[in-house]
Amino acid sequence: MGHFTEEDKATITSLWGKVNVEDAGGETLGRLLVVYPWTQRFFDSFGNLSSASAIMGNPKVKAHGKKVLTSLGDAIKNLDDLKGTFAQLSELHCDKLHVDPENFRLLGNVLVTVLAIHFGKEFTPEVQASWQKMVAGVASALSSRYH
């Protein structure tokens, strides 16, 4: 996990303040399920995931995506302690849900793509670098309880 500079923190926090958590969360999780279809097996209870349009319109996907990004908001407030912030979620995803930790990295990369789409020119290479560092840190923290 990289160390966050004050500039990284300011960059991440500034953009995060403009993110519509509900929309971006649903789009991020939806894209993950479409682009990496093997991740769908963790969401059997979500109903129809048979096509891209079914996934992107699925209210359970949108609701869980919002939940995921809401917890990411907690991480943004605690960038210096991502491992502590995600200790319980790491345990849940490891011990109970048996999620492949690689999926956390994939989700982070999809989020960066969604932010780039939504923010266009504002999502400069410097902004992307800070966000990539953050999503990598979150993926690492979520993977920390795996053995």
UniProtKB/Swiss-Prot annotation:
Protein name as catalogued: Hemoglobin subunit gamma
UniProt record similarity statement: Belongs to the globin family.
Organism: Papio cynocephalus (Yellow baboon)
Role noted for this protein: Gamma chains make up the fetal hemoglobin F, in combination with alpha chains.
Tissue: Red blood cells.
Top-level taxonomy: Eukaryota, Metazoa, Chordata, Craniata, Vertebrata
Pfam entry (one): Globin
Record-level Gene Ontology MF annotations: haptoglobin binding; heme binding; hemoglobin alpha binding; metal ion binding; organic acid binding; oxygen binding; oxygen carrier activity; peroxidase activity
Record-level GO cellular component terms: blood microparticle; haptoglobin-hemoglobin complex; hemoglobin complex
Domain of life where this protein originates: Eukaryota
InterPro entries according to UniProt: Globin (IPR000971), Globin-like_sf (IPR009050), Globin/Proto (IPR012292), Hemoglobin_b (IPR002337), Hemoglobin_oxygen_transport (IPR050056)
Domain Globin span(s) in chain numbering: 3-147
Annotated heme b binding sites: H64, H93
Cystine crosslinks: none
